[in-house]
Structure formats: structure tokens, C-alpha cells
Amino acid sequence: MTYKFPDNFWWGSAASGPQTEGAANVDGRKPSIWDHWYKIEPGRFFNDVGPTNTSNFYYQYKEDIALMKQTGHNSFRTSIQWSRLIPDGIGEVNPKAVDFYNRVIDEMLANNVEPFMNLYHFDMPMSMQEKGGFESREVVDAYATFAKTCFELFGDRVKHWFTFNEPIVPVEAGYLYDMHYPNVVDFKRATQVGYHTTLAHALAVKEFHALEIPEGQIGIILNLTPSYPRSQNPADLKAAHIADLIFNRSFLDPVTKGEFPADLVEIIREHDALPEYTEEDLAIIKNNIIDILGVNYYQPRRVKAKEYAAHPDAPFMPEHLFDNYEMPYRKMNPYRGWEIFERAIYDIAINLRDNYDNIPFFISENGMGVEGESRYRNADGMIEDTYRIDFIKSHLKWLHKAIEEGSNCHGYHLWTFMDCWSWANAYKNRYGLVEVDLDNDFKRTVKASGHWYKELSENNGFED
């Protein structure tokens, strides 16, 4: 069967500044929370590999953009590091950072690769974290100023802007589950961070629309993880509804509809965790919705009704309201510990079609991390990652079905272009179309999937 996609479909990939640029201590950049956390707890990073060098994009961006073109990219998303552009979080703009991002943008355009630019990818400047991070209203305003600065500096050439990547992740990883700095476990503080992140997003949208950039669009990148109940039993259905409210609709509803779900607000109120807010700020959220949505999809969430009550003195967690459910015989990526469930990408698209005014969206991340890929190297030195090609195809088939049924999808970006640093997992799992050899001066080698991806893009689809 032939799977053809709409004209002008975005084929490309996504990455981020902190995961690829390296040059962490170069040309005026100051520490983010990742530099600080690695400094004080290097043992929490796989093989003690920190964020200092990552994949060396700062120095090899020209080679990398040429490889993007070679692997069929017509678009690519990365992020501007706040700690590089405005090293103190507020105040003076770093001219060397402006020069770097200008060169990257211009090189992309010269190679017919459309830049998609994100403003925040988990990388709070340490100077801002010391003020409380997104617990602080002052930092919300500082972020809005940073966003406006980016729009003014680069908006003449960058038309596709995104305020945050996966904003739920710093909330849950940094303030609930002790997986990111500042390693807080406190539901009320987490809700304050989530609310202030939403407000910061809305303020950036307001600044962007005020500039009236021709053909400009602004959106947000959300990791939508559909919540599937174990059964159709009412208690299981309620568990799935609650998980969906907390992990998906907490951001999806306010950025598309301008308001938080009433059921979610009630849950937060019941657990005495309402954030500090003002009516003026709620109006800003209400009046500044997105133009386009980026959807990151990796895995489903399967849940069931609680089997045992939580300890009454334990800190409240979302899992006090549902249990995670491990479906028997599910297909897994054993390296990442994630279920592979391709149909969910269809379910997301149809949900957006039916419940969110069929908002324009694109798949902004989807990918497969594999450990020890060098064992798949052939005699010519190329990694034969046919498993990645199969993974992409199987998801695109379901995306194609959703498009045929009227969902408003405009593109597909793989995570990721080249092997990159994955936070505390460092380089444990590799996701790229292009191999990066950390032991050989960051040498780049296109994998089998990269050659196939060029065919996919050139044909605007594939046969299978």
C-alpha cells in the first residue's frame, strides 16, 4: 500500500540547545540547572556524562545542517538557550549568542531547512532558579522578556515559534518524582510551577501576537500520553479520566481553550494545592491561545482503579488517585522501558479533531532510543537500524489514517536528528538518524534510517 501525505508536509526532526550545542562554558553562557546539578551530583548521570560538551553542535552546526539536507529535512526544531542568550536570566543580551543563533538560522534557510524555534527545553538558568524558578512570579516576567527578545532578534526569519517543550516534565520530574533538579517532592509547589508555566506561556503568546510577524505562528510542544483504562468498569474509567486531567489536559486545555478543566481544579482544591493566582493573570491565559500545537508522542499511559489506599502521612502524589496498569503481552522498547503502541498517535489526532476544534498540529517528536547500537554496525561502518525504520513506518501508518479521517496534521518530526545527550540518561540510549561518535571527535555517520528518511521526504510518503 502507498501512504502519501499532504502537500507541503513538514518532514524533519527535533532536538534542543542543551542536548546538542555543548560549549556550556564558552562565549558568555552561564550555568543552567543542569550544569549546577551535574556539578553537585554527577553520579546521578549515566556514566557520569554531564551537559558540558553534548554533541558539539555549537562548533559543527554547518556540517550538521548539511546532513539535515542530506537526510531529507525540510524543517528542524531546536531551542534557544535562555542561559546563553541572556546569561543572567534578565538584563544584558549576550552578543556572541545572538551571532551564533543568527548563523544557525541563516545556514538552515540557505539549505532550505525551515527553522522551528523553541524557547524552553527544561533548561532554567541557575540565576533564575535561585529566585525560585517558576514558583516565582518574577521569573515568569523574566521569561516573557526573554521570549520577546527572541522574537525581536530572530522573528524576521523564524516563522514557527514554540514557548515550551513538554512543560509537564519539569513539573513532574522537578517537583514530584525527584528526577530533575531541584528534586522537590511537593504537590502544591508542583501545581504552582505548572500554573506559572502556563502563565509564562500565555505572556509569550501575547508578546508574539503584538509584534504581528508576517506568516508567524506560535504554539507549544506537549507530550500527550493517552490514558487508557484497564477495563470499561466505572472505577477504571474514572482513574483514566483523572490521569488524563493531570498529565495531558492540565496544559492542553488552557493553551487551546484558555481555561483549566473544572474537574482538575476540583482535584487540586480537594488536596489543598491551589496555586496563588490573580484574575488578571487568568484573563491573560484566557485571551492568548496558540496558533499551532506540537505533539510529542512516545508511549501510552495505562491505568486502573486504586487497589490499596495510600499511606495517610505520605506526601500526596497523583498516583494516590489511580494505579498504573501493566497490560499483559504489551510490545515494549526494552532499553527505554516504554510500551510501543502505535495506535495512540491516531487516538491523539482524532481527540484533537473532535474535542479541540481540529486545531492545526504536527507530530513534533516520536522516536526510539536503543542502547548499544554499535552492535548493528555493518562492514561499511554504518549502523543498520532497520528497527527504527519499522518504528517510524508503523506510527506513520496510523497518522496517515487520522489525516485521511480529517485530522489537521501538518508534519512529522522524529526525535532526533543526531544522537544527543538525554539528561540524566546522557548517551545511554541513541535516537538519531545520524550517529555521533563521542570517542572520535564527535564524528557523524548517517545511519540506515537517515538514508531511508531522505526517501520518505522526497516521496512525501512510503510504500509498505
Region spans (language model):
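Active-site region of glycoside hydrolase catalytic domains
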Residues: 1-45, 88-90, 98-464
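A common structural microfeature
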Residues: 8-10, 58, 75
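Aromatic- and Gly/Pro-rich amphipathic surface segment
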Residues: 31-66
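Catalytic domains of carbohydrate-active enzymes, especially glycoside hydrolases
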Residues: 60-81, 287-292
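A short acidic, glycine/proline-enriched capping/turn motif at secondary-structure boundaries
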Residues: 74, 83-85, 122-124
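Glycine-rich, proline-tolerant flexible connector loops at the mouths of alpha/beta enzymes
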Residues: 80-93
